[in-house]
Amino acid sequence: MDTVNSERLAVLYARIALGVAFLSAVADRFGLWGKYGGWKNFATFTDYTAQVNSFMPAFIIPFLAWAATAAELALGIGLIVGFWPRWVALSAAILLFLFGTAMAISFGIKSPLDYSVFSASAAAVLLAVYQGPKSGANS
């Protein structure tokens, strides 16, 4: 397999892996994973949002839960479909970085490291860089 095809497959794999991960998390919030889900319903996810964002005022927690859900749904679809790939990947990287930072503040640094949140954010940054404008003979 040549380098160009290998790179394209790697980018496609990263887009699909990140996109499906976002959509899986959203599906779990609405009970679509059934007994295999962690949250199983939106109320439980909202409680988790409050724990992760323990430094935020209580009145903003429902907004954060819905905003995260809407962002993850849009980013998941955008990554899989390939819509505005650079900007969607960069947005995913920022969202994951913010989530990891909130986890670190509320639970300690081990939590986002154990769940590979910063690793996923870094993968999204790499994806954004690869999706940028190309120049040169092999682009």
Q: Which residues does each predicted region cover?
A:
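Extended, low-polarity transmembrane helix blocks
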Residues: 1-42, 51-70, 74, 81-139
